[in-house]
Amino acid sequence: GWEGCFFQAGSCPGTCTHVWNYAQTVANLFPRLEQNMRETEFLRETDGQGKMNFRAKIQLEGKPWDMYPAVDGQLGSILRVYREWKISGDDDFLKKIWNQVVSALEFSASYWDSNQDCVLDGQQHNTYDIEFYGVNSLGNSIYYAALKAGAEMAEYLGEHERSQKWRSMEQAGCKRMDEMLFNGEYYRQVTDGDIDEYKYQYGEGCLSDQLLGQTLAHLYGLGHLFPEDHVKSAVFAIYKYNFKERMGSHKSLQRGYAYQDEPGLLLCSWPSGGRPKQPFVYSDEVWTGIEYQVAAGLIYEGFLQEGLEIVRAVRSRYDGYKRNPFNEVECGNHYARSMASWGVLNALSGLQVDLPHNSVTISPKVNQDCFSSFYSTGTEWGICRQFKDQSGALIQSFEALYHAD
């Protein structure tokens, strides 16, 4: 798939892994299509060493691609294998690509972790179209979520030794990263030497994507990766420092997606100073896909009103008067990252689908005594409800309106 579309052509081909990392809509509405994407990524675009192309160059052009792997895209694809398996309950799908999943995760552990201390610190290409250096929580949080998901899949497949290895790496890495990066309020970036030795870093900044891996872990039923109080502090700091009720005098020399009296969430800010001379290029921009994933993260951590305020901010900009309400723009129209919006729905309903273990549950964050919402799995869709019966007990029900044969 394209990332977006221009007026005469598509924008950025090849189902870019680090952009589709955010998208939740297709997996929940067209799950077999997402399975096909994972098959392409692991069976076609991952080489014998486990390095994955973050664009489907082999599938589209029939030739290798001499480009860095993307840390967030590659590790996110492993997480999405877990998501697709949980949503569908399709063991054959998992077994078909499992060897390449193992290869991709082992490659990540060796390629980006220079001293094998379970913390990624190498040159990390990412969704901002640059490389981060040193230790940052964007790549590492996705790494630990991928290790935790990998351990669960390995255990299910009977690979107990591998499962224990990855689980130990995840636990050790989470503890070490938290100790290295948490500054008492949020997770920063640490590099060797002066932050300005490298272009396009963020250092002491409050990155909106700093806990992307944690949000994905919540969406996919993996729970907290880091101390809960630290996570709550960090996600609230993102709202506190990066959300602007009006852009006003905010200065940006990059693309403009929010103006003047419009609200929006910046990709990064430096509340205590320390802004690099050349921070990553998009840091002053507003991206709807990141706004939605932060909103979902806030809702999961109990900041319901703050999460909904960010969603309302997006929709106030795309109100049908100033902008097309069905076309949220980033690098092109109808941008794929915006499909992070479905994650907000699942955060509000608390939907968790685990078909390999025959489980579908909800944990609503709103209207707990009288809740109803759309739900979907890999085999059916319908209406889920939670309500109190005459005795005051909470009852959940799932009314399937469609079930696949």
Q: Model-flagged regions — what are they?
A:
Residues 99-103, 234-237, 312-316:
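Amphipathic alpha-helical scaffolding segments
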Residues 15-19, 70-77, 101, 136, ...:
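Active-site-proximal structural scaffolding
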Residues 4-169, 174-177, 219:
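Substrate-binding cleft of carbohydrate-active enzyme catalytic domains
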Residues 258-261, 277-280, 284-285, 291-405:
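Non-catalytic C-terminal accessory modules of carbohydrate-active enzymes
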Residues 156-205, 213, 218, 222, ...:
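Repeat-solenoid scaffold signature
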Residues 31, 87-90, 156-159, 179, ...:
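Short, well-ordered loop/turn and helix-capping segments at boundaries between secondary-structure elements
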Residues 1-8, 32-68, 110-135, 178-287, ...:
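Extended glycan-interaction surfaces of carbohydrate-active proteins
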